A protein has these predicted regions:
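Basic, helix-initiating cap at the start of DNA-binding domains
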Residues: 12-14, 18-63, 72, 76, ...
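An amphipathic alpha-helix adjacent to DNA-recognition modules
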Residues: 46-54, 61, 66-67, 78, ...
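Alpha-helical DNA-contacting segments of helix-turn-helix folds
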Residues: 60, 94-102, 144, 152-155, ...
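Append "Primarily bacterial transcriptional regulators
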Residues: 68-75, 84
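Hydrophobic alpha-helical connector segments
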Residues: 111-140, 164, 180-181, 189-193
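Short secondary-structure transition hinges
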Residues: 132, 136-172, 181, 211-215
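Amphipathic alpha-helical packing segments from all-alpha helical-bundle domains
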Residues: 153-178, 187-192, 219-230
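Amphipathic C-terminal alpha-helical segment
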Residues: 193-212, 227-238
Length: 244
């Protein structure tokens, strides 16, 4: 190889530099750094955060949580891994923000589904929207339950608020069945019912029980909700008769 010709895989410089000399590789390193600096200047911090989250979400959808790494995110967005840690505390922080996106999307789907009047129809619509969401985005939904914070690390308050918002949707749908002063009973019943819906959803998504398939899960959820709400109504009537 002619020593004055650039390295076959290296960048082209305006002057002839022997590729096997230290000076050539100094130029290469400088060239790469300048290129990266140029890319960085095109993105604001907010845009860069979104790029990181977009890449992380795409990796999780393709390969699950196990396939996520700072190096892979960096490769996809064209920045160094260190850039990720300038934007987020650590990889767990990145995952939490991806989870927040999932929770926001789920909350929007549920809110749209609840635009019906009858209490039972509202709860059924809420549960069916949950089922549909998990069926459409299984790896993102599984992320909510696969990811654990490191030992000693607390889940941030903003994340807890998003979880509580979802549960408040269930409470809002069931509220007409309870007297205003029965808030504790409403909370308990909402959690009991939603635990049942989540159990059916988990079995359907795992696809390990022949009797709980994705198709059958919608019927099972409707039966669960109608029977549970009927039981609440019967208990309420019984209580009223005793009081009377």
């Amino acid at each position: 190889m002619n020593p004055t010709v650039r390295h076959p895989t290296g960048p082209r410089f305006p002057i002839a530099v022997p590729w096997h000399t230290p000076y050539y590789w100094t130029l290469v390193i400088t060239f790469v750094r300048v290129q990266r600096m140029g890319r960085r200047s095109t993105h604001t911090p907010d845009q860069l955060r979104e790029l990181i989250l977009d890449a992380a979400q795409a990796i999780i959808v393709a390969n699950g949580l196990a396939g996520l790494s700072a190096r892979e995110i960096a490769r996809r967005i064209g920045y160094s891994p260190g850039t990720i840690y300038n934007m987020f505390e650590n990889l767990d922080d990145v995952v939490l923000h991806v989870e927040a996106r999932v929770l926001d999307a789920l909350d929007q789907r549920i809110e749209e589904a609840m635009r019906v009047d009858a209490t039972e129809d509202k709860v059924v619509a809420l549960a069916e929207s949950y089922l549909a969401f998990t069926s459409e985005r299984p790896k993102l939904w599984n992320l909510l339950f696969e990811h654990y914070m490191p030992s000693g690390a607390d889940t941030p308050p903003w994340y807890q608020q998003k979880l509580e918002m979802l549960m408040s949707r269930v409470e809002t749908a069931m509220a007409p069945l309870f007297a205003p002063e029965d808030h504790v009973a409403l909370q308990r019943s909402a959690r009991v019912l939603w635990a049942g819906v989540h159990g059916i959803t988990s079995l359907a998504t795992a696809n390990k029980l022949a009797s709980v398939t994705t198709d059958a899960s919608a019927i099972l959820v409707r039966d669960l909700i109608r029977n549970y709400l009927a039981g609440l109504a019967a208990n309420s009537e019984s209580t009223q008769r005793k009081v009377g």
